């Protein structure tokens, strides 16, 4: 397994048109019905409040969700793949790097599309693209590995990692070897086999089918990125996207640090066990390390193992856990191990600036 290349950028953004009137959004719905490109996903029993979605603009990189209500605000969210929108052709692996010029160009395309979907009153536009609110951005890193890499082993490592406080696992049934996600209401972190995902949707170009690409993605909703990136609500779209792009590595690294509190090699379980047993560490420390190693390997993951370790050894001070992680680091062993059938260790993932710059594609 060899990491060949690291690409980073923004995959998707979501722009929201809010405070629309009922009749304004109805014009757009009528047009999408005429085009045979709208689907209702929710309606109350009186059809007072309903949610719809449309793929009418998907070839140009936009998916729409529409919310229409008699007694609440009406709005449309536009999930935009900037790379596809700007080039006019589907870009399965391109990641967007914002500039002032391409943000203006993107907004120009959006203005044309508002007219096309009849988002207007008396032939006049009802809003300008710069009035849209940025409601989400997906900060993304693609790790391109050599073709002998088993990505399912890497994803398994994430499944065995430390679950951060306030986060919950999200599962895709039958996709455990290809997908990992943890989330709160405002932030999600995903790790998945990008080529597998493209193939499942029959959207993988032939030239990429043998590639091994692990995608790491932090998706932040508005309140999260305003707080974490130090942005103001009045900041324009370029300022927000530029700040997001500049913080891709930091956002991903923050999750990696939480998931993997020790930075040693992920070794096959028997080898990790042997290194601890043969070390010159205190026997009581070795006992606790082996306990944690075993529980992590056989259980749900490092967070569950840590809880059992605290109960078994009557640990109250959380600093003792971090001290134990330092003992793992001394041996260059990670408590999250590979299965016994795997032959080679895997370095703990690290997105240092040096690591990224060395493997960034040449411009």
For every predicted segment, state its role:
Residues 1-308, 312, 331-363:
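Structured, helix-rich domain cores that form ligand/interaction pockets
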Residues 318-321:
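Helix-turn-helix DNA-binding segment
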Residues 326-330:
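Residue-level detection of the helix-turn-helix DNA-binding "recognition helix"
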